[in-house]
């Protein structure tokens, strides 16, 4: 089988004789578009890349329809880092800093005392939230610990960020023993050792088929068709207008007076600006009032 160049793709694969499943993802435009409208410190860029990869892999391995949020909160220079994703592999990310961060800052230096919160919101079913202490050197290690604690499934992650052909790129591998399988720790350890041999230039530059052959050429690997990833913010003029209506009308009128009759709202995630004068706001209000009367 052959595939076109695998930028912004996620692949699932299965080791037929090992009862272990895997995933591979590479984020090119998905990652760079996340960074385009922000001037994040280098260490924050790398962390967001790692979180994007982790969110992509988690969304695929959990196999649900809905959204997932991976969020870091701490009392260090990096106040917040959050990634949202869904089953369509549409991803977005945002970070907020409150002090300078060195380019080579470690996770603990950026976060201070913090937690990693994973929120899973299926379209049908109950919402789930897991809180993980950021007590290990990397996001990867914290997530591996999360799977052991919450899913009782041995899981291994390889997550890398860097540059390839002059552009930011992030990529990763996930290995996991199949639930209710006969997979052995020895099988998993063997595949994990092979995964750790992957070089950055292989992870960022090779097509999936070639990469997996280099790593696992002695294994029987079934590779499934890829899924595309993309940066997708999801903001809209309608959402911004409805957000304004959360304020009392007196406060909205004051804002209009202060801003020469036009309120501008900029999406913190993608940078898109939306402008609203009094007429536009009243149109949103009339529509909201109609929906309220209908009980919607």
From Swiss-Prot:
Pfam families xref list: HSP33 (PF01430)
InterPro entries linked to this entry: Heat_shock_Hsp33, Heat_shock_Hsp33_C, Heat_shock_Hsp33_N, Hsp33_helix_hairpin_bin_dom_sf
Post-translational modification (record): Under oxidizing conditions two disulfide bonds are formed involving the reactive cysteines. Under reducing conditions zinc is bound to the reactive cysteines and the protein is inactive.
Location in the cell: Cytoplasm
Any one Gene Ontology molecular-function term assigned to this protein's record: unfolded protein binding
Keyword set includes Metal-binding: no
Swiss-Prot/TrEMBL keywords: Chaperone, Cytoplasm, Disulfide bond, Redox-active center, Stress response, Zinc
GO terms classed as biological process: protein refolding
One of the record's GO cellular component terms: cytoplasm
CDD domains on file: Hsp33
UniProt keyword Cytoplasm, yes or no: yes
S-S bonds: 233-235, 267-270
Role this protein plays: Redox regulated molecular chaperone. Protects both thermally unfolding and oxidatively damaged proteins from irreversible aggregation. Plays an important role in the bacterial defense system toward oxidative stress.
NCBIfam families per the UniProt record, alphabetical: PRK00114.1
Similarity remark: Belongs to the HSP33 family.
Protein name: 33 kDa chaperonin
């Amino acid at each position: 089988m052959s595939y076109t160049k695998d930028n912004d793709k996620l692949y699932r694969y299965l080791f037929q004789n090992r009862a272990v499943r895997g995933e591979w993802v590479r984020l090119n435009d998905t990652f760079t578009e996340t960074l385009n409208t922000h001037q994040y410190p280098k260490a924050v860029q790398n962390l967001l890349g790692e979180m994007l990869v982790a969110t992509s892999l988690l969304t695929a391995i959990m196999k649900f329809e809905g959204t997932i949020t991976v969020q870091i909160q701490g009392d260090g220079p990096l106040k917040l880092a959050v990634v949202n994703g869904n089953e369509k592999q549409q991803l977005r990310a945002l970070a907020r800093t409150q002090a300078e961060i060195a380019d080579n800052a470690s996770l603990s230096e950026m976060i201070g005392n913090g937690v990693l919160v994973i929120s899973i919101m299926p379209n049908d079913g109950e919402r789930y939230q897991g809180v993980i202490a950021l007590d290990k050197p990397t996001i990867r290690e914290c997530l591996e610990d999360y799977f052991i604690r919450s899913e009782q499934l041995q899981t291994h992650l390889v997550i890398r960020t860097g540059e390839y052909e002059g552009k930011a790129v992030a990529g990763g591998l996930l290995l996991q023993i199949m639930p209710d399988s006969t997979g052995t720790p020895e099988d998993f350890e063997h595949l994990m050792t092979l995964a750790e041999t992957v070089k950055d230039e292989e992870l960022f530059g090779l097509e999936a088929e070639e990469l997996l052959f280099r790593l696992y050429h002695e294994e029987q690997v079934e590779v499934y068709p890829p899924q595309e990833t993309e940066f997708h913010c999801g903001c809209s003029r309608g959402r911004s207008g409805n957000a304004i209506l959360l304020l009392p009308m007196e406060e909205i009128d004051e804002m209009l007076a202060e801003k020469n009759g036009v309120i501008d709202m900029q999406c913190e995630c993608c940078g898109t600006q939306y402008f609203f004068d009094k007429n536009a706001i009243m149109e949103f209000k009339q529509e909201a009032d109609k929906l309220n009367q209908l009980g919607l």
